[in-house]
């Protein structure tokens, strides 16, 4: 089962409750804008004929938050009040009405009693489900068909060497034949997911020091009963259990994988030494160096709750996963669900002036050498949904002398480039409408009500 990721409007990690009780939605604005930028680029690829059939990788899907308990209900209502008056989120709906929730999430309401006031939900209909595996294959095929690009599969970069002329010598292994060959280049871009940190360390640049990685597997339970799958049509987030890190927020999602509609619940984190799903059990240990061991130890001391949670997840059986699912879907039957292991993510651990040694970085991190000859993309959530914004950041930070020349072409691909979708409501609505049409998503605009 391929690991799927998407920007979730409902993810409350991006709307943080402040000490005074207010809700800060600034991160939600930023992430939402970045996702709108990604949609523009994908829409351009469709319009220009570089990829086809957007419904093979993106579907419209409501995003919903569902909570129980007085404190959680109050939080969700305060969150709704903070978001509803901002144009990006003004289509948000909120209810504590039992019958209304039965319309939004009928499967999840089966077996529940109407206790009034202990449950609440909020909903935005403009959410999406994105299959990044399908999108990646479409983009790779487009590059493969281009006369200007060579795409090599089953090849692995095994080492780097800085040459006296300033170029980089890249050593590459053909995993089919075992042959190793070399290639010289002026610039290195390392975008290898969980494998990025070991590759960055091989460059030996100073910026690769004092950082490490914490590998986490993702497990999901997937529904195998078509009748159950058809009763749910949303991505629904809950609230993280008390005493657990915010990254543990569970969700029950309608997903489209290889053209088939399915239903997933999770994730359940599972720690292990591999940096990649099919990596080596020595990955983590090989990444521990004299120059980063103090960073890793500091992270362990600072993040005891996360480590405890991860250990608890390792020993969780399918029965434990099903018990967790029943807090969402009380009528869930064991025989209708199957446990799968998805991909890997490697949370970046680094030293910072603001947070000291061993800070776990939640989010993507761009690392570049002082001379900008090495650029590495590290980290995780929000991940793929913001990848286009990250690519633009890489270009702007490392090739500033070219950005003015590139701007017209970038504007053609991403019409909002250089402008703010957060501060310009008219532009935001125009862009949303256009990308909705380009990607065949449908469109709902409160301004037209």
Each PLM stretch: what is its role?
Residues 120-187, 385-398:
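Helical element adjacent to the flavin cofactor pocket in flavoenzyme catalytic cores
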Residues 10-17, 207-234:
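Central beta-strand plus flanking loop segment that forms part of the substrate or channel wall
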Residues 190-205:
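Flavin (primarily FAD) binding-site architecture
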Residues 30-38, 68-75, 122-142, 152, ...:
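Short beta-strand to alpha-helix junction loop
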Residues 120-126, 134, 275-405:
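C-terminal catalytic lobe of FAD-dependent flavoproteins
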């Amino acid at each position: 089962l391929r690991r799927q990721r998407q920007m979730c409007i409902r993810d409350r990690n991006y709307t943080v409750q402040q000490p005074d009780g207010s809700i800060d939605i600034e991160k939600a604005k930023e992430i939402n804008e970045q996702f709108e930028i990604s949609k523009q680029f994908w829409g351009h690829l469709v319009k220009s004929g570089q990829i086809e059939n957007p419904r093979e990788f993106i579907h419209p899907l409501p995003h919903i938050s569902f909570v129980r308990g007085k404190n959680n209900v109050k939080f969700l209502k305060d969150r709704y009040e903070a978001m509803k008056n901002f144009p990006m989120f003004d289509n948000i709906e909120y209810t504590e009405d039992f019958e209304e929730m039965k319309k939004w999430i009928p499967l999840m309401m089966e077996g529940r009693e109407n206790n009034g006031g202990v449950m609440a939900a909020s909903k935005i209909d403009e959410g999406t489900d994105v299959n990044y595996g399908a999108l990646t294959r479409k983009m790779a095929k487009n590059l493969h068909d281009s006369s200007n690009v060579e795409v090599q599969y089953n090849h692995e970069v095994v080492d780097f060497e800085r040459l006296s002329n300033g170029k980089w010598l890249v050593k590459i292994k053909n995993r089919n034949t075992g042959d190793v060959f070399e290639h010289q280049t002026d610039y290195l871009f390392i975008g290898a997911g969980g494998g990025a940190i070991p590759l960055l360390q091989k460059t030996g640049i100073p910026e690769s020091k004092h950082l490490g990685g914490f590998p986490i597997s993702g497990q999901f339970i997937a529904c195998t009963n078509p009748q159950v799958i058809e009763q749910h049509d949303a991505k629904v987030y809950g609230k993280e259990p008390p005493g657990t890190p915010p990254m543990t927020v569970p969700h029950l999602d309608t997903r489209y994988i290889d053209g088939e509609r399915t239903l997933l619940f999770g994730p359940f984190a599972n720690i292990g030494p591999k940096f990649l799903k099919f990596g080596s059990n020595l990955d983590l240990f090989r990444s521990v160096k004299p120059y980063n061991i103090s960073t890793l130890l500091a992270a362990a001391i600072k993040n005891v709750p996360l480590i405890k949670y991860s250990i608890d997840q390792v020993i969780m059986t399918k029965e434990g996963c099903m018990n967790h699912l029943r807090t969402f879907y009380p009528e869930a039957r064991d025989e209708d669900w199957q446990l799968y292991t998805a991909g890997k993510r490697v949370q970046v651990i680094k030293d910072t002036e603001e947070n000291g040694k061993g800070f776990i970085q939640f989010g993507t991190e761009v690392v570049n050498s002082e001379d900008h000859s090495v650029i590495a993309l590290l980290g995780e959530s929000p991940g793929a949904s913001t990848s286009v914004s990250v690519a633009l950041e890489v270009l702007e930070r490392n090739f500033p002398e070219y950005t003015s020349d590139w701007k017209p072409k970038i504007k053609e691909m991403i019409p909002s480039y250089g402008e703010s979708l957060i501060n310009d409501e008219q532009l935001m609505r125009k862009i949303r409408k256009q990308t909705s049409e380009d990607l065949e998503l449908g469109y709902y605009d409160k301004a037209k009500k």
